[in-house]
Amino acid sequence: MAIIDGIALAAATKAEAAQKVQALREKGVVPCLAVVQVGENPASQVYVRGKVNDCAECGIESRSIHMAETATQDEVLAQVRALAADASVHGILVQLPLPAQINEKAVINAIPPEKDVDGFSPVNVGRMQIGEPCYLPCTPAGCIRMIESTGTDICGQNAVVIGRSNMVGKPAAMLLLEKNATVTICHSKTKNLREICAAADILVAAVGRAGFVTGDMVKPGAVVIDVGINRGADGKLHGDVDFAAAAEKAAFITPVPGGVGPMTRAMLMLNTVQAAARQNGLAYRKTLQPVEIAHFQSIFIGGHVPTMKIPLESKIAFESPSGMRT
């Protein structure tokens, strides 16, 4: 069993973004991400700080707009529309959840598709469903990159996604389907859940219940991606997967913390850079130079630590954009 190191993979992904930022800056384009937070949710504050730090690491300009808990929907919409009209802002992210008086869908819908770097707007969701150019939701896109980092060929694999949320479960299933996996989506009404999961070559857990996936639900040799982030009574973060039990059977597994979370933010950086390029009539023509980093941690002391090759761009040129899919 090997742990997929999301921190190392995210670092390589952000290095890729930083190279693209440098190339854009040489063209006079400074990528900019605006993050709108409404209220004092402690978790949201942590997430926003993380995104601001990631931007700084990649050379992306960031704007953090913090609105009062009592802000009205009209005030939030006005802020989003102002950012939408600002040509120097290339990506807009509204940190969720929002206070009860604000309609989240209305706010997300107000973000122009070309600046929707979270990939949540109806236009981007619809484009993804039919395979058209779009910005992919960051968490599902990060999951795909993590699976592929193991050397697993997704094509033809039996993939099971537990959870059908609009932000993770459904888009993760669509991206796996696009990679030619045979996909099953499981949810609270699914019968024979244990048997279905135990047949999965790729198992993505996004149900929001700590330890929901037990060892007997994991097929020997499977790739297990744990999207869950649950705060336990001990104050620690726990995933949706019983890590110790699943690790005995999986070939590859993501930890919590240090797995999917860092990759979500890294994919946001890539989407933001791509948005800046697109909005300035530029797209990347890539010359790829693989860079090796250690990304798996063997749980066996003294065990072999495999490496992966992340294709970073040794040269970046520009051409007219043909689509936004990343």
Regions found by a protein language model. Give the residues of each.
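Adenosine-phosphate binding glycine-rich loop
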Residues: 13-19, 23, 27-29, 33, ...
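Glycine-rich phosphate/diphosphate-binding loop of Rossmann-like nucleotide-binding domains
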Residues: 38-52, 134-219, 223, 241
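Anion-binding alpha/beta catalytic cores of soluble intermediary-metabolism enzymes, centered on
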Residues: 93-154
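Low-acidity, Ser/Thr- and Arg-rich intrinsically disordered low-complexity segments
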Residues: 298, 314-316, 320-326
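Rossmann-like adenosine-cofactor binding region
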Residues: 185-260, 264-278
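Short, well-structured alpha-helical segments in soluble
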Residues: 75-87
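Short beta-strand elements in bilobed, periplasmic/extracellular small-molecule ligand-binding domains
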Residues: 55-69, 183-185
